[in-house]
């Protein structure tokens, strides 16, 4: 392959715990590669992948785990917090609700800004945004001196009601930047201009906590690649690397968001509107539900810390191909959340002796050692067997039964995740198709579907690198929000239109400042609505049809809210008044890149098996034909038992299932 030159290609990059995926879209064709991740320097795996595909330049879009790992591993910057005097302990106090109501030993996560690094400043803005006490500039000078003496690496600023009037936060920002130019500083009125001081403070502290490391990584990667890089946000759109460095909290679920975008658009292209996506990589599994749209939330919790920014609604469990199996203190088999990663990796990698889900699938024959990554990486089945035999001895079983047990446990973890995002949110999983992706997702698809009553599995052409594809084709987006606290009345339509007009003007200005053509800029409007007196809201799309007056608007949003409330919580109450809490705007510059399609023609011949080997389905070993996915023809039925292999995954077709390929090279597995 010759070197790929600028403006001829689009490159999607997704860094996982085990592999880093690179996808190249060039001349309406897709080329993919997977290289081992390099945890000590994640950018090195990116460079290795680009070299493998001989990519020298192009348009780069990156799904990154730097912010995620920094938060999960507590390896962020020494962070100071400046807040309104008397509110220094808001991070410590938090909310009264407990994550596990009946756990007497529940451990709250330590605040990311410890007590001696939290500073109170004399100032006050009231609930109408009016300054009633000026900022104490002399005290601010003392605080800055204390921060400088403490060797703090970053500062977060969160003042009461700054979302209504950010003047004091902006003044603090300018003063710090003039005194300590090298210090990383975030202010809450820029990151999340919304009410609820605990969640707002937590979000801006997280931003400052992960900021220096993300900023350093972005600078390092941009220097190595020598071209601008866009970065995937948790909300499913891309931003510049500069904005990602300034607001890295928006990238907390960067990679998983790319996967959902790739899954949703691939399914939509094939005419499938309702999917449950399940991204099973090396370390974890990310599950999301798309009922004819990608679902977003504005209130999330990561590692015990609340984050109030728009994110695709994703539920994550510690169940991946590299998840380690062991016997716990109670003598039971457990799988995960610890992962073997890429180094040393599963036992079959030949480096360590960790027993993982990948080893179990290999021993059961669902992964064939000579077909892994297209035969470019040979797996050591003897090492896997030796490692799993030790586990089997502990539980007095055979190696095969131990492997089956590992699969059952990890499947149970994923089944619970599917229930959480479907049944617990008012959706029947039987109404959806399962779309498994990631390197390990398809291996578990038939069993998961059978347990959940799902009758259709949809597998796109490149499931192992679908997150990288989603990252590459994502729209350019930016989210805006503002707290309004409106009870619908005669002036509601005018008030909301005024807010939206201001945000749309800001969006155009922001996109223009990035040198982007805004002629195709679109705006999606949303409202956070609740019943008066509730402490939680639901995200409701703002009506798009022409609205005559505030009365019609009130009727429309009330109906939409009550429908959503009924689905989510099982009831609604038309006698209760509603309240608009926040207005939200998503500015979207649609991607011009479409998913390349194969358009397979029907053939008179059919793809033949390349081999036949014993494979365990449930507890039974069956002689099973093995097919190369590329050999399977349009509308050719592959009845289970069968194993379909390709570069980035393996697909066991269980007895009672049949696989069929469509003209876009997608595989559909259905119950016979």
Regions found by a protein language model. Name each.
Residues 13-42, 111-128, 378, 478-487:
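Short glycine-rich, Thr/Ser-proximal phosphate-binding strand/loop in the N-terminal lobe
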Residues 77-126, 130, 188-192, 470:
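Active-site phosphate-binding/coordination module
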Residues 42-43, 49-50, 189-196, 200, ...:
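ATP-dependent carbohydrate kinase catalytic cores
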Residues 158-204, 542-544, 580, 585-603, ...:
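Terminal amphipathic helices with adjacent charged low-complexity linkers/tails
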Residues 1-79, 133-155, 170-188, 212, ...:
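N-terminal glycine/serine-rich phosphate-binding loop of ATP-dependent small-molecule kinases
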Residues 15, 138, 142-146, 272, ...:
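C-terminal, non-catalytic interaction/recognition modules in large multi-subunit enzymes and RNPs
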Residues 33-38, 80-86, 106-108, 247-254, ...:
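Glycine-rich phosphate-binding loop of actin/hexokinase-like ATP-binding domains
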Residues 23-31, 97-102, 111-131, 152-153, ...:
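Gly-rich Lys/Arg/Thr-decorated short loops/hinges at beta-loop-alpha junctions or inter-strand turns
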């Amino acid at each position: 392959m010759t070197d790929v030159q600028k403006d001829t290609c689009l490159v999607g990059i997704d860094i996982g715990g085990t592999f880093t995926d690179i996808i190249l879209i060039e001349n309406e064709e897709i080329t993919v590669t997977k290289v081992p991740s390099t945890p000590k320097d994640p950018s090195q795996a990116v460079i290795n992948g680009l070299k493998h595909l001989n990519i020298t330049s192009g348009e780069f879009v990156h799904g990154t785990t730097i912010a995620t790992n920094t938060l999960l591993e507590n390896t962020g910057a020494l962070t100071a917090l400046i807040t309104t005097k008397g509110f220094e302990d808001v991070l410590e106090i938090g909310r009264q609700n407990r994550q596990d109501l009946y756990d007497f030993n529940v451990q709250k996560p330590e605040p990311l800004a410890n007590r001696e690094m939290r500073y109170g400043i004399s100032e006050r803005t009231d609930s109408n945004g009016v300054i009633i006490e000026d900022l104490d500039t002399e005290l601010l000078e003392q605080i800055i001196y204390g921060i400088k003496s403490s060797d703090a690496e970053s500062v977060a600023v969160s003042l009461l009601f700054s979302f209504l009037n950010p003047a004091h936060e902006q003044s603090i920002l300018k003063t710090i930047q003039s005194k300590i130019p090298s210090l990383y500083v975030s202010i809450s009125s820029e990151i999340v201009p919304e009410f609820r001081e605990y969640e707002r403070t937590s979000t801006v502290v997280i931003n400052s906590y992960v900021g220096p490391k993300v900023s350093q990584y972005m600078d390092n990667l941009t220097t190595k690649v020598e071209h601008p890089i866009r970065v995937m946000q948790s909300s499913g759109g891309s931003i510049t690397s500069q904005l990602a460095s300034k607001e890295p909290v928006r990238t907390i679920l960067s990679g998983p968001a790319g996967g959902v975008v790739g899954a949703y658009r691939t399914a939509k292209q094939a005419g499938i509107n309702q999917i449950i996506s399940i991204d099973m990589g090396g370390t974890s599994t990310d599950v999301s539900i798309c009922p004819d749209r990608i679902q977003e939330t504005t209130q999330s919790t990561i590692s015990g810390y609340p984050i109030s920014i728009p994110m695709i609604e994703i539920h994550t469990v510690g169940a991946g191909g590299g998840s380690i199996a062991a016997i716990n203190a109670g003598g039971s088999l457990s799988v995960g959340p610890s992962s073997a990663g890429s180094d040393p990796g599963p036992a079959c990698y030949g480096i360590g002796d960790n027993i993982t889900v990948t080893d179990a699938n290999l021993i059961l024959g669902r992964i064939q050692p000579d077909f892994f990554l297209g035969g470019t990486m040979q797996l050591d089945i003897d090492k896997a067997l030796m490692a799993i035999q030790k586990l089997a001895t502990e539980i007095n079983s055979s190696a095969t039964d131990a492997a089956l047990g590992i699969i059952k446990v990890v499947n149970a973890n994923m089944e619970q995740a599917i229930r959480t995002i479907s049944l617990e949110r008012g959706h029947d999983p039987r109404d959806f198709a399962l779309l498994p992706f990631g390197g390990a997702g398809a291996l578990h698809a038939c069993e998961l579907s059978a347990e959940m009553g799902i009758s259709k599995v949809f597998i796109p052409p490149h499931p192992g690198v679908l997150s990288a594809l989603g990252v590459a084709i994502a729209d350019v987006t930016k989210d805006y929000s503002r707290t309004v606290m409106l009870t619908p009345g005669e002036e509601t339509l005018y008030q909301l239109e005024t807010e939206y007009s201001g945000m749309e003007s800001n969006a155009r200005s922001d996109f223009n400042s990035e040198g982007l053509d805004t002629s195709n800029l679109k705006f999606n409007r949303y409202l956070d609505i609740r019943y008066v007196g509730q402490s939680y809201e639901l995200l409701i799309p703002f009506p798009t049809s022409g609205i005559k007056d505030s009365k019609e608007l009130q009727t429309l949003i009330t109906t939409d809210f009550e429908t959503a409330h009924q689905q989510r919580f099982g009831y609604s109450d038309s006698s209760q008044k509603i309240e608009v809490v926040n207005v939200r705007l998503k500015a979207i510059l649609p991607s011009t890149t479409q998913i390349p399609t194969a358009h397979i023609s029907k053939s008179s011949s059919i793809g033949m098996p390349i081999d036949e080997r014993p494979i365990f389905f449930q507890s039974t070993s069956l002689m099973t034909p093995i097919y190369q996915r590329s050999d399977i023809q349009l509308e050719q039925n592959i009845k289970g038992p069968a194993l379909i292999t390709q570069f980035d995954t393996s697909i066991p077709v269980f007895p009672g299932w049949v696989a069929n390929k469509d003209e876009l090279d997608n595989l559909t597995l259905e119950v016979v």
